[in-house]
C-alpha cells in the first residue's frame, strides 16, 4: 500500500491508464460483469462526458496512476476510482477531500445500493443518505448521498 502520492490535474496522456484502472477496479468489485466488454463504451463516456464536463484529479506515484476523482461544476462526483492495492489507504480520503475543496458548497453522488464497502467509506467521510434512485446508465438501484459543509 502506497503512503506517498501526489494529486494533480488530469492530462490527456492519462487516458489509457485511467480507463484500465476503471476496468480493473470495477471488475474486482463486480466479478459477474464483463467490464472488458464495456471498455469502448467507457472510453467514449470518459471523453465525451467526464473529460468534457468535469474536473478530474489523479493520484500518482512515480508516474503510476493510483486513483482519480471526477467532480463537475454542480458538485456531482461521478467517479471515485482507487486501485485495489490502495483500498483501505488514505488515497481515497485525499481524493474526496479534493472534491470537497473544489465544490465547497456541497458534493452529491450516486452509489450502488449493493456496494456496502463504498457506502461505509462515504459515511465515514461525512456523506449522508439523500434518497434512493436508479442509475440512469446501468439501471441498478443506487443511493443518493451528499456532503454539506
Q: Where are each of the predicted segments found?
A:
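Conserved N-terminal entry element of GNAT/NAT acetyltransferase domains
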Residues: 1-13, 147
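Conserved GNAT-fold acetyl-CoA-binding loop/helix
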Residues: 15, 19-46
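A short helix-loop-beta-strand connector motif used in the catalytic cores of GNAT acetyltransferases and
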Residues: 45-58, 76
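Conserved beta-strand in the GNAT
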Residues: 58, 64-81
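A short, internal acetyl-CoA/4′-phosphopantetheine-binding micro-motif in the GNAT/acyltransferase core
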Residues: 77-87, 111-112
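Conserved acetyl-CoA-binding loop-helix of GNAT-fold acetyltransferases
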Residues: 82, 88-101, 120-124
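Conserved GNAT acetyl-CoA-binding A-motif
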Residues: 102-114
